[in-house]
Regions:
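Conserved acidic residues
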Residues: 14, 28, 54
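Rossmann-fold dinucleotide-binding core
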Residues: 62-66, 70-124, 133
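Rossmann-like NAD(P)-binding element
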Residues: 20-47
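Single conserved hydrophobic/aromatic residue that forms the stacking wall/gate
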Residues: 1-12
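Redox-cofactor binding/interface segments in oxidoreductases and associated redox assembly factors
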Residues: 30-32, 57-58, 101
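An accessory alpha-helical subdomain
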Residues: 126-229
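A short helix->loop->beta-strand "cap" motif at the edges of active sites that frequently abuts
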Residues: 50-54, 75
Length: 229
């Protein structure tokens, strides 16, 4: 997606068939919406035809390699991450959804995306690249791994309960996502420690269940209820 200012209006084009068309358009901002696997390749392909004052932008959920690429490109940039997708979010009402803007980004680029995300009623947070990766490792890898485990041990149910059906819907939605995207999120260097936390909690819970420890279960439920307040 390429954008440029015409007077005080923003002119946006999202369909180009050749690099020459992009060159003639002379964009002031390029938003790279390629899938995670091809984000860097897409940038490298168009860099030679972009004006030097063009702002590069991505909306990738995985930022691996992007900071280094931007710093070496010589271009200004703005990196953001809408923390939702069409699988689960209600795109007609995004007021409960969030977006992250990378703090190292160019000032004008940040202003553009703040205005855009505010117009969608999103909750906006500004994180560094490192803080973003830490957040993704926590907020995505934990539910992803938990869902994977549910799917792995699941058996077909003739009369599933409400909770089971809700978990099933989440599992089907998550597993419809691109394999490479799931892989890259889980291969975040910060993910293993989050998965280790899950294993620790499962071990503790299994001991309580195996021992039929009513007092231990009461304490455990009290602890986790406090977590979700």
């Amino acid at each position: 997606i390429c954008a440029c200012l015409v007077g005080s209006e923003m002119c946006i084009r999202d369909s180009f068939t050749t690099l020459e068309e992009i060159k003639e358009f002379e964009p002031e901002l390029v938003i790279n919406a390629a899938t995670v696997k091809y984000t860097l390749d897409a940038f490298r392909k168009i860099l030679p035809v972009l004006p030097k004052d063009c702002i590069l932008s991505d909306i990738a959920s995985v930022k691996t390699g992007l900071k280094k690429f931007y710093e070496e490109s010589g271009f200004r940039y703005v990196s953001t991450h809408p923390m939702f997708g069409p699988t689960f979010a209600s795109l007609s009402n995004l007021s409960s959804e969030s977006a992250i803007i990378i703090s190292e980004s160019d000032h004008l680029g940040k202003v553009f995306f703040k205005d855009l995300y505010n117009s969608l009623n999103l909750n906006i947070f500004e994180y560094t690249f490192d803080e973003h990766d830490e957040t993704v490792a926590y907020s995505l890898s934990i539910p992803f791994v938990s869902t994977f485990v549910f799917a792995a041990v699941m058996k077909h149910q003739e009369a599933p309960g409400t909770t089971f059906k809700k978990h099933m819907a989440i599992a089907k939605g998550l597993l419809s996502e691109d394999d490479y995207l799931l892989q890259e999120i889980l291969f975040n260097p910060r993910t293993p420690s989050q998965v280790e936390n899950i294993r620790t909690e499962l071990k503790q819970l299994l001991e309580i269940i195996t021992n039929k420890d009513a007092e231990g279960m009461k304490k455990y439920l009290t602890k986790i209820r406090e977590k979700i307040k």
